[in-house]
Swiss-Prot record:
Keywords: ATP-binding, Calvin cycle, Chloroplast, Kinase, Magnesium, Metal-binding, Nucleotide-binding, Plastid, Transferase, Transit peptide. The lineage of its organism: Eukaryota, Viridiplantae, Streptophyta, Embryophyta, Tracheophyta. This is Phosphoglycerate kinase, chloroplastic. ATP binds at K233, G252, G324, E355, D386, S387. CDP binds at G227, G251, G349, F354. Pathway: Carbohydrate biosynthesis; Calvin cycle. HAMAP family: Phosphoglyc_kinase (MF_00145). Belongs to the phosphoglycerate kinase family. (2R)-3-phosphoglycerate binds at A51, D52, N54, R68, S90, H91, G93, R94, R149, H181, R182. Coiled coil: none annotated. Its EC number is 2.7.2.3. Its main location: plastid.
Length: 433
């Protein structure tokens, strides 16, 4: 309503006087990047690149979505264009020991096609045969090592195993954001033996947006948090409450907040053990002067199914036996108006059960609104998980400033945690003042 708009406008005016710094200005997170390395640093050097090539494969070993492979290409291209010898490492799936269906062999044709050269494939990731292939690599060549998780030592971050991996190369590039929150041999252990250890372009972009833009946003800064459970998003909400001006909540978690406020929620999803927490988060938002918006109306259903009967009711009027599965049209309008005032938005988690067409309107409306404000110059960040699927489904992914490729890694960064795979990298050179 009007009071909300006035509240936001008064905040906006108070920010106009503040200076804006460039995104990379977050000193604590500035890492040396592969872009800082020139041909003088790279020509003839063996570079161990840990990428995240964990792509989905069908039963015939065909790649069903090559997004992660495409995302790894800029870093590899920069290295080969500067005469490096690239030793590429990744995991795929969660193999228990050597498991042929988790081999990286099916990735070779697509990698070769995207790089415009024949990628050589090793049948192992350490040992004499691999060492021989490394010795034969020409400048600008690429060797793909076998799935690093075929060794249980990888996830144990075994120092002997890390040393064997590191012995293949002269320097290290981590471009695997999706596993940066894990201290494994190929993400953290190898950095103890290889200097410099630097961030790849993909990892760098994730840090620039999820840490840089969130720590030092163009304001007003809004966070949209959805998803079915408060429990999985507590850390994110608590961390973002410290930084954002507007917090919009949607998805199944809202019913825990409603119940905490004494409203009846019918048979909607509620986490009974999180009611006190919901109350304290509402109080914290008030104390911090954050405009926390909960949906004022919801789309309810008589069962959890695509063909359920549905109707729109005020949030305070959910009858027994009905469950809320999406935010309603009034909420979409209020949320959209709030987003129109913003300069930076981060979105993590859908507004409703968008897999069912009947309950997808809220999520789709948010995606379209983000496309609209993005085109007007706002910074829009999709913080991993189901929100990524949502913007892709609506066809607005191209318009977003940044779409995070991480699941757990994105959440941990948004929770304000340090990631082991990032901490292990060399600091950026001090910028001359």
């Amino acid at each position: 309503g009007a009071s909300f708009s006035l509240h936001v406008l008064s905040k906006i005016n108070s920010y106009k006087s503040q200076s804006t710094k460039p995104i990379r200005g977050v000193a604590s997170m500035a890492k040396k990047s592969v872009g800082d390395l020139t041909s003088a640093d790279l020509k003839g050097k063996k570079v161990f690149v840990r990428a995240d090539l964990n792509v989905p494969l069908d039963d015939s070993q065909n790649i069903t979505d090559d997004t992660r492979i495409r995302a790894a290409i800029p870093t590899i291209k920069h290295l080969i264009n500067n005469g490096a010898k690239v030793i590429l490492s990744s995991h795929l799936g969660r193999p228990k020991g050597v498991t042929p269906k988790f081999s990286l062999a099916p990735l070779v044709p697509r990698l070769s096609e995207l790089l415009g050269l024949q990628v050589v494939k090793a049948d192992d990731c350490i040992g004499p045969d691999v060492e021989k292939l490394v010795a034969e690599l020409p400048e600008g060549g690429v060797l793909l090592l076998e799935n690093v998780r075929f060794y249980k030592e990888e996830e144990k971050n075994d120092p002997e195993f890390a040393k064997k991996l590191a012995s293949l190369a002269d320097l290290y590039v981590n471009d695997a954001f999706g596993t940066a929150h894990r201290a494994h041999a190929s993400t953290e252990g190898v950095t103890k033996f290889l200097k410099p250890s630097v961030a790849g372009f993909l990892l760098q972009k994730e840090l620039d947006y999820l840490v840089g833009a969130v720590s030092n946003p163009k304001r007003p800064f809004a966070a949209i948090v959805g998803g079915s459970k408060v429990s999985s998003k507590i850390g994110v909400i608590e961390s973002l409450l410290e930084k954002c001006d507007i917090l919009l909540l949607g998805g199944g978690m809202i019913f825990t907040f409603y119940k905490a406020q004494g409203m009846s929620v019918g048979s909607s999803l509620v986490e009974e053990d999180k009611l006190d927490l919901a109350t304290s988060l509402l109080a914290k938002a008030k104390e911090k002067g954050v405009s926390l918006l909960l949906p004022t109306d919801v789309v309810i259903a008589d069962k959890f199914a695509a063909d359920a009967d549905s109707k729109i009711v005020p949030a305070s009027g959910i009858p027994d036996g009905w469950m809320g599965l999406d935010i309603g049209p009034d909420s979409i309008k209020t949320f959209s108006e709030a987003l129109d005032t913003t300069q930076t938005v981060i979105w993590n988690g859908p507004m409703g059960v968008f897999e069912f067409e009947k309950f997808a309107a809220g999520t789709e409306a948010i995606a379209k609104k983000l496309e609209e404000i993005s085109k007007k110059g706002a910074t829009t960040i999709i913080g991993g998980g189901d929100s990524v699927a949502a913007v892709e489904k609506v066809g607005v992914a191209e318009a977003m400033s940044h779409i995070s490729t991480g699941g757990g890694a994105s959440l941990e960064l948004l929770e304000g945690k340090q990631l082991p795979g990032v901490l292990a990298l060399n600091e950026a050179d001090p910028v001359p003042v």
